[in-house]
């Protein structure tokens, strides 16, 4: 009975929730029905609190639907059910998996991550930046899932999300999260061997090992770490020997229950020049996108950065900067640094007029690059239609969806009002523009393809 009940709940929740959310929060749960009490076991307190806060109503509604008058009492616990009595085992799937199923991957060869002794004879270069942690990472809708996944990995390395693959454009916080995970793991286990590096460093180390006839030492070094954090994995493209060695390193680490975290500027399957067998393995754990920050997050980033520098930044000034610079966090912080430097040099107060002057060239370039005309041309080219189609009255999906996307882009990337955007799209009403923006926002939550289109277009228009 309990097996059928929880499987029914899983099937419905997978239909109702975005794939990433289902894989990250629901799949790891184990269930047991005993004495009219349904116990759900979460791998750690973080998952338990998140599920109870975000999905309790969904689960209760399904229990009421499936059980009628005999609804069991729902109880949450941290831990796992003893194997002999376990009802549903957690299944590790990619965030983009379309159906439940066991992922084909090697079983860990060591039972507990915590019980592995440190290898004192090897000298490790951690390279983890202690300045980057979860506390100073500004969370928003665009990066919420990525931060949550990274936090879980830091709390439970070598667990359900192995490997963790983070992808998104430049300057969105992927590297910050890598370092935050590294710091989190080492805070929990000070003697952990955590190694952070750019993918090019892996290539350089391998080349040096080949030159010095030290390839066995190279293998031993990388295969004995507790956690390997590699940035910009796309730079492995077309480096066949490096890919071959990383393939075997990857397998060895997973078999040893050692944590792997990778970042890239694109979704794993879209990385050109990387072998399919590697791209397949990249998706064995959890794949999460980081998108450009929305307005509220950009404002929060500016305010936090100013606070770290003991600078009083008026809210209207932060909003002014955030509304005009939209591409990534790095650009925002660079602009704020310039404003702060100018204020220190001149002794002037930071006002909107002062920011206009300090960032004159940057703002002028941004306004020149991102216009509604430019957006229309870029979107039309991306979807292989004509600009005239976007302005027409045609309602076919092949035209209507790109038109909605272009309107959403115009609202996101320009300072034009909704009526002005509507006028630029064939004299449409502002309510049509508002509907388009809300529709695209909804589809970004439901469709991986729409989310990718949005991110690709933002990246193109903001570069």
Curated annotation (Swiss-Prot):
Listed GO CC annotations: cytoplasm; plasma membrane
Main location: cytoplasm
Protein name in UniProt: Chromosomal replication initiator protein DnaA
Domain notes: Domain I is involved in oligomerization and binding regulators, domain II is flexibile and of varying length in different bacteria, domain III forms the AAA+ region, while domain IV binds dsDNA.
Keywords from the UniProt entry: ATP-binding, Cytoplasm, DNA replication, DNA-binding, Lipid-binding, Nucleotide-binding
Family classification: Belongs to the DnaA family.
Annotated stretches, region: Domain IV, binds dsDNA: 344-463
Region (Domain III, AAA+ region): 127-343
Region (Domain II): 83-126
Residue positions binding ATP: 171, 173-175
Source organism: Erwinia tasmaniensis (strain DSM 17950 / CFBP 7177 / CIP 109463 / NCPPB 4357 / Et1/99)
Keyword Ribosomal protein attached: no
Organism domain of life: Bacteria
Entry-linked Pfam families: Bac_DnaA, Bac_DnaA_C, DnaA_N
A GO biological-process term: DNA replication initiation
Subcellular location: Cytoplasm
Residue segments, region Domain I, interacts with DnaA modulators: 1-83
HAMAP family linked to this entry: DnaA_bact
Complex formation: Oligomerizes as a right-handed, spiral filament on DNA at oriC.
InterPro entries: AAA+_ATPase (IPR003593), Chromosome_initiator_DnaA (IPR001957), Chromosome_initiator_DnaA-like (IPR020591), Chromosome_initiator_DnaA_CS (IPR018312), DnaA_C (IPR013159), DnaA_dom (IPR013317), DnaA_N_dom (IPR024633), DnaA_N_sf (IPR038454)
Role description: Plays an essential role in the initiation and regulation of chromosomal replication. ATP-DnaA binds to the origin of replication (oriC) to initiate formation of the DNA replication initiation complex once per cell cycle. Binds the DnaA box (a 9 base pair repeat at the origin) and separates the double-stranded (ds)DNA. Forms a right-handed helical filament on oriC DNA; dsDNA binds to the exterior of the filament while single-stranded (ss)DNA is stabiized in the filament's interior.
């Amino acid at each position: 009975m309990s097996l059928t009940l929880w499987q029914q709940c899983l099937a419905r929740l997978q239909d109702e929730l975005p794939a990433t959310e289902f894989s990250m929060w629901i799949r790891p749960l184990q269930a047991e029905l005993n004495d009219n009490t349904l116990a759900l076991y979460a791998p750690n307190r973080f998952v338990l609190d998140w599920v109870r806060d975000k999905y309790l109503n969904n689960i209760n509604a399904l229990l009421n639907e499936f059980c009628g008058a005999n609804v069991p009492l729902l109880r949450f616990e941290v831990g796992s059910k003893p194997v002999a009595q376990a009802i549903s085992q957690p299944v590790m799937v990619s965030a983009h998996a379309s159906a439940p199923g066991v992922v084909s991957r090697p079983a860990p060869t060591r039972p507990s991550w915590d019980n592995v002794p440190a290898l004192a004879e090897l000298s490790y270069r951690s390279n983890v930046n202690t300045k980057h942690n979860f506390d100073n990472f500004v969370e928003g809708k665009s990066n919420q899932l990525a931060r949550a996944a990274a936090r879980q990995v830091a709390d439970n390395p070598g667990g359900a999300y192995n490997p963790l693959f983070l992808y998104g454009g430049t300057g969105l916080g992927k590297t910050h999260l890598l370092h935050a995970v590294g710091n989190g793991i080492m805070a929990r286990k000070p003697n952990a061997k955590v190694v952070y590096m750019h993918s090019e460093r892996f290539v350089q180390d391998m080349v040096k090992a080949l030159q010095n006839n030290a390839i066995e030492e190279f293998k031993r070094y990388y295969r004995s770490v507790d956690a390997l954090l590699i940035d910009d994995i796309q730079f492995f493209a077309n480096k066949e020997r490096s890919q071959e060695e990383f393939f075997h390193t990857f397998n060895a680490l997973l078999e040893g229950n050692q944590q792997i975290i990778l970042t890239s500027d694109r979704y794993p399957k879209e990385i050109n020049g990387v072998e399919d067998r590697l791209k397949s393995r990249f998706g064995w754990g959890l794949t999460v996108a980081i998108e450009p920050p929305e307005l509220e997050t950009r404002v929060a980033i500016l305010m936090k950065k100013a606070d770290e520098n003991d600078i009083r930044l008026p809210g209207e000034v932060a909003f002014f900067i955030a509304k005009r610079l939209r591409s990534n966090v790095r650009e925002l912080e660079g602009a704020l640094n310039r404003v702060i430097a100018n204020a220190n040099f001149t002794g002037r107060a930071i006002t909107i007029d002062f920011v206009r002057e300090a960032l004159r060239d940057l703002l002028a370039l941004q306004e020149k690059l991102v216009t509604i005309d430019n957006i229309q041309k870029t979107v039309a080219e991306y979807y292989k239609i004509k600009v005239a189609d976007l302005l027409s009255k045609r309602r076919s999906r092949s035209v209507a969806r790109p038109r909605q996307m272009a309107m959403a882009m115009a609202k996101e990337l320009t300072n034009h009002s909704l009526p002005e955007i509507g006028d630029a799209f064939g004299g449409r009403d502002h309510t049509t523009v508002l509907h388009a923006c809300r529709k695209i926002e909804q589809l970004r939550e439901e469709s991986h393809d729409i989310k990718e289109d949005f991110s690709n277009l933002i990246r193109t228009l903001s570069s």
